[in-house]
Amino acid sequence: MKKIAIIGGGAAGLAAAIATGNELVRLGAADECEIVLFEADPERVGRSILATGNGRCNFSNAHIDPACYRNTDFVEAALRSLARLSGVSEWGSAQPVGAYGASAQGSAQPAGTSEAPGRESTQSASVFEAPVQRFFSDLGLMWREEGEGRMYPAANKASSVLDVLRAALDVSGARVEFGKALSAIEAPARGKGRFHLRFSDGSIAHAEKVVLAVGGRGVSAVDTSSVIPCELTRPVLGPLATDSRITRQLNNIRVKCAVSLERSGSLVAREEGELLFRDYGVSGVCVFNLSRFACEGDVLSIDFLPHMSAADRDAWLFARRKHLSARLGGNGQIAAEDVLRGAMLPQVAQVLCKCAGIDPARPLSKKDVLALSRVIGGLRLTVRGIGDAKQCQVSRGGLSIAAFDPQTMGAVRASGLFAAGEALDVDAPCGGYNLHWAWSSGLLAGVSAARSAVSADGEGEGE
């Protein structure tokens, strides 16, 4: 009996195991192969899923665009390949077939009144979204769509996503071995036979087909040198450390703003949203997204009034100075702290004044107004690096995508080896994109591994 090993019981690994089992059943080969999922956690699979989306699990996005991903062309090719496997046309129509095998009726429910309505059917989903939506619809998950296309389970708890995955895993035919952290993988002799899997507890396993879904941090701990090149990973999608002389004065204060990332005077990227000041730097979704591109020495420019042009901001401050001076009986004289009162928190106003070289308690001159306006539109912080690696949601690096075929997720020069999820050098911004990639690549790798195990030549070509 051939063995298919799934390494890692996170999002990608669970999707791969379920898809492998489903495809073997569809091919009438469930009795010919053994599926074993090796999970590093000593007790359970999917623990990492419970922490996503602040415990709510932003499991996908309703507007998936491959351009949002690192290594865009590879991701687009993989998503299109998965769509073809699941019977999705270019416009998301047609009934699902193959490993997904279920209708998509009633897959989503409307959200609350403050949210955009969720999809009532996956028929309206695009070629990039439909396969994942159909997969979860088949498992019985109900969801809703919130702002910016973020998709959450209707139960509003990450555990509901894990519950349907674990139920599907139970009937997939996969056997789970816990406490198995992979330390090395060795290729079959002369390219034929079984892969040798070495684990940190000293045990060894063998498998004809292997799906590596160990995550970004996990892949760095695996010696893959005999089968595939692997780049060291570094944490991204997290807070940034900056010059803390400014940020420590604003620790734990949140502001709505726009943040631009600049390098050598040129714009690298820009994000709008909520920013959280920390004693070591800055955090928040907009910062997390910029961290994917940030390098030490770059500059973050924070615009506290992003919907005003520089001229409008100047005019606003002059008009505010004039109005409040008359209102407060200042005879044309009013301090900066009075002008900013009601528009910004006092701590923020104090820091902005200090950065503009203004005494917040002294009358605000015309020159001071212009200086303050410039700082409000561009408080500058120098990036020192990642602020807290433990908060980072993904890793940059891992297995080189050049070594894999996006049509199958199979290794080009190591037949029988597949990879999925964050183990590959693919990452995306916040909003459900990274989990969407985990499910998608896991499903594609699982189907391909099953077909490879069953096919006469073992190459796993699509039917």
Residue ranges and their predicted role:
Residues 178-193:
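A conserved short coil-to-beta-strand element within the FAD-binding core of flavoproteins
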Residues 5-7, 38, 182, 204-217, ...:
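Short hydrophobic core segments
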Residues 425-454:
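A conserved FAD-binding loop/helix module that cradles the flavin
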Residues 178, 350-427:
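A glycine-rich dinucleotide-binding beta-alpha-beta segment and adjacent secondary-structure elements
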